[in-house]
C-alpha cells in the first residue's frame, strides 16, 4: 500500500479533509465529491501516480487502476485520523 505521505498528498490535493464530502470507488477510479473545485491541486494529487484526473463540477475521478480499493481504504483511514 502507498505510504501515508502519498495518501496525504491526495487529500491535500482535493482541498483537505474539510473540502471532501464523500469518497467512493469503482473498478479503477477513486470517486470523490468535494465542496469547492477551486481548492483542487492536481500537482499534489499527481504525487501518487495515476493515469488521469476527470473533473466535472464538484465530482472528481482519479484513475488509479486495480489498486484503487486499497487507495480508497487508505484515504478513508487517514481522513478518520485527522
Predicted regions and their residues:
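Membrane-embedded alpha-helical signal segments
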Residues: 4-82
Amino acid at each position: 500500500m502507498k505510504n501515508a505521505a502519498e495518501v496525504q498528498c491526495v487529500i491535500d490535493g482535493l482541498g483537505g479533509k474539510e473540502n471532501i464530502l464523500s469518497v467512493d470507488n469503482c473498478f479503477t477510479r477513486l470517486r470523490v465529491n468535494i465542496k469547492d473545485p477551486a481548492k483542487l491541486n492536481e500537482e499534489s494529487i499527481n504525487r501518487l501516480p495515476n493515469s488521469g484526473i476527470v473533473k466535472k463540477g464538484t465530482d472528481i475521478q482519479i484513475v488509479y487502476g486495480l489498486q484503487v480499493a486499497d487507495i480508497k481504504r487508505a484515504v478513508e483511514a487517514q481522513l478518520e485520523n485527522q
